[in-house]
Amino acid sequence: MSISSILLSLFFILNILLAIIVIFKERRDASASWAWLLVLFFIPVLGFILYLLFGHNLRRKHLFQWEDRKKIGIERLLKHQLEDLETKQFQFNNRATFDNKDLIYMLIMNNHAVFTEDNSVDVITDGRDKFQRLLSDISKAKDHIHLQYYIYKGDELGKKLRDALIQKAKEGVQVRVLYDELGSRTLRKKFFKELREAGGHVEVFFPSKLRPINLRLNYRNHRKLVIIDGMTGYVGGFNVGDEYLGLNPKFGYWRDTHIRLQGTAVHAIQTRFILDWNQASHHHTLTYIPNHFPDYGPKGNVGMQIVTSGPDSEWEQIKNGYIKMISNAKRSILIQTPYFIPDASLLDALRIACLSGIDVNIMIPNKPDHAFVYWATLSYIGDLLKAGATVYIYDNGFIHAKTIVVDDEIASVGTANIDVRSFRLNFEVNAFIYDITIAKKLVSTFKEDLLVSRKFTYEEYLQRPLWIRIKESVSRLLSPIL
């Protein structure tokens, strides 16, 4: 027997073993199991490699044992809220919070997402505005700057932000930068050399320990967080790069949604950053530092919870929050998302809302940045069009916003897309906002986006050509592993 025959036989045996693992050991979602079995069957050698990189379920194993809030900062507030829930003494100060108390309860109990009502929130929908504000806040920093992004590019915007951080580090401000290795794969280590020399610290999330193989490649930190002096925070969809200023000809204008906030909710963002930082850092880990959690009094009256999820989570908290919002809807649901690949539970919740007479509106991009994801999105959109949803295609560039608004009362803004990757594999963060004024601001933004969007009807969907139907079918089949 030739060497090639032996190798083929070996790969065939390994494929069978992997199939057994996929079916019996991993205990994954049935649709994901079938998708991986198809990959292993049709492309046995490449499929084996892809499974090692993207398919092996490392969820909630020793890989993710870094969750420890007790020495970080919000444990005391969380303890009081859990006690108030048990004794039914929890208080709400406005209609939006009272009407959604079951959602607030769920996120406190299952995500330890502390609820605060002393926040001010600014909604930002333009990249130039976002980074102008961020650079202004950085220039005023006195104690520390904590910055975390999935994508950080070494282009003009990346350099401008880096140089601002270098200046603050030279002034004695503590600067910490955390970026994801895969998302920021074009960034060279020397890019932050001067920042390190100025006293700043830079860490990489889940770097490859054995290049080019990284068994944690499938689990990426998709969070975008900035905390300045423990008083001002940013969270949302914008990464760092010129394309987010609308300078990439492929995408054109980049429409995203970010929020700038002040208030006790910043402490929750700070806690999340420190937990992620301590996982990535081996020499500069952080414990509780009073300056990271200053007591500066109320900044507003916006109710809010900072909700995180990831492969270290027991529950898919952000997805569960979405489902609860949708299930509680009485009048309307507005969704903006670049990718729409819901699992069965979320799809059913939206379908039931449509069939119950709720006005469900969904806005998606007119162009793909990931082809398979785009075609899978159209497939699921077809299901909801049939159920009565209204769908809009954004035509003024690329819409990357991840927002949900329900009944013009509550909203979610953050990093999580409506897809399986965001719900189960990526580390994500969303702000759940219980405030009519902020909700109406997001509704107004949605209406402004309608002016540069076109309605996508069910009749139009039914008339799509055969080649698009084939693309959709294949992409949907693979959607659980995209």
From Swiss-Prot:
Its EC number is 2.7.8.-. GO terms for biological process: cardiolipin biosynthetic process; sporulation; transmembrane transport. It is a multi-pass membrane protein. The keyword Cell membrane applies. PANTHER family: CARDIOLIPIN SYNTHASE, PHOSPHOLIPASE D. Disulfide bonds: none annotated. Disruption phenotype: Cells lacking this gene show a lack of cardiolipin. Cells appear normal, no effect on flotillin cluster numbers or size. This is Major cardiolipin synthase ClsA. It comes from the Bacteria. It catalyses: 2 a 1,2-diacyl-sn-glycero-3-phospho-(1'-sn-glycerol) = a cardiolipin + glycerol. It is found in: Cell membrane. Belongs to the phospholipase D family. Cardiolipin synthase subfamily. Its main location: membrane. It is an enzyme of class 2 (transferase). Keywords: Cell membrane, Lipid biosynthesis, Lipid metabolism, Membrane, Phospholipid biosynthesis, Phospholipid metabolism, Repeat, Transferase, Transmembrane, Transmembrane helix. InterPro entries: Cardiolipin_synth_Firmi, Cardiolipin_synthase, CLS_N, MetI-like, PLD-like_dom, PLipase_D/transphosphatidylase. SMART domains: PLDc. Catalyzes the reversible phosphatidyl group transfer from one phosphatidylglycerol molecule to another to form cardiolipin (CL) (diphosphatidylglycerol) and glycerol. Gene3D superfamilies: Endonuclease Chain A.
